[in-house]
Amino acid sequence: MSYKFETLQLHVGQEQADPATDSRAVPIYQTTSYVFHNSQHAADRFGLRDAGNIYGRLTNSTQDVLEKRIAALEGGVAALAVASGAAAISYTIEALAANGGHIVAQKTIYGGSANLLEHTLPGLGITTTFVDAHDLSAVEGAIQENTRAIYIETLGNPNSDIPDIDAIAAIAHKHNLPLVVDNTFGTPYLIRPIEHGADIVVHSATKFIGGHGTTLGGIIVDSGKYDWKKIGKFPGIAAPNPSYHGISFADAVGPAAFVTYIRAILLRDTGATISPFNAFLLLQGVETLSLRLDRHIYNTKKVIEYLSKHPKVEKVNHPSLKDHPDHALYERYFPNGGASIFTFEIKGGVKEAFKFIDNLKIFSLLANVADVKSLVIHPATTTHSQLTEEELLAAGIKNTTIRLSIGTEHVDDLIADLDQAFNA
């Protein structure tokens, strides 16, 4: 039987009560290790011939439910939960491009991801070319002989610009490259990138998946559609791996080879493991994902209407507005709405921006987004402060740019708070 999203977000991974305790809620399996039935059972687990828990750094039964649920919601074959979104992105890029690989990346991405690609990963031999994702010829033109993936976000950070995922997927696959899509801001409730050609989907589960500003976590989802053996560019996944008994992950586990490789090699060796408690908290968030997103979207629409008419606002950067350059893409990829994280330009300069932010009462000034509580920040001096002036302008960030993350409070109270801050 096929179930709707709202049912899947509650039940996948635990279709029946916990067999050991009859608990209907997913238990927190707070353990480091697991008893094997006998020596052969242990050998089969380590040889990947029998799926199941080996050691807490790699797997946990609470974590397993979270992974199965997100994989189902995204339409993937398997997922891996890790300690943070940064870990999910780092592992994904390292698995694809280690030892001299190259990435083509959308230039308007989260500042932390941009910093990882531009400054940290070159020390590991991984280079990146940043491109305007709207210029498809630039995307294709940036591909080199050693390119190993194209990397984009469903909704850019902080301005919610939207790439044409279908078109970029076609370019990636024309050159036998996997397309990696960060769907943190989109969420599988609003858009499923795998349906548009993505091969790998990553999330900072800290954001909408958790939804309450309490829990760090990251997710990597494997579409199962990329043929790692046929292409020949990824020997760590397809060829016999010397650090894991000579196993070819593509042969041993088939479509789930990518996330299995990361779990068995990168997670094993570097240990960005999600805790059972954090996996449990993220599951609580998943169970209300659709309900929260509906309210986020409703509130965002009302706030945008207010800001668009305010005399102290120079411009609102939201793809739902008809004058936004990505409006057509927004209607195509987000028919049910989206983008509750967006920016606007306040008239004046940085002084006016700081004054407005510092006078808000309900909106919290902090670096997180996608919380049930409404949030605000000045990107140029915080989240994107590592970027040069040229890089900030390329990312569409000015000294007058203010980022809002619209929560689920009553929208009348949010608008009243914005209004008093403008008038302070």
Show where each model-derived region lies:
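N-terminal "arm"/small-domain region of PLP-dependent enzymes with the aminotransferase-like
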Residues: S2-N60, K68-R69
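Conserved N-terminal alpha-helix of the aminotransferase class I/II PLP-enzyme fold
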Residues: N38-S90, G112-H119
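Well-ordered beta-strand positions enriched in small/hydrophobic/aromatic, beta-favoring residues
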Residues: I150, G218-I220, V316, F342, ...
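Active-site beta-loop-alpha junctions enriched in small/polar residues
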Residues: L155, T184-G186, L321, K347, ...
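Conserved small-domain helix->loop->beta segment predominantly found in fold-type I
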Residues: T270-T273, F277-A279, Q284-T288, L293-R295, ...
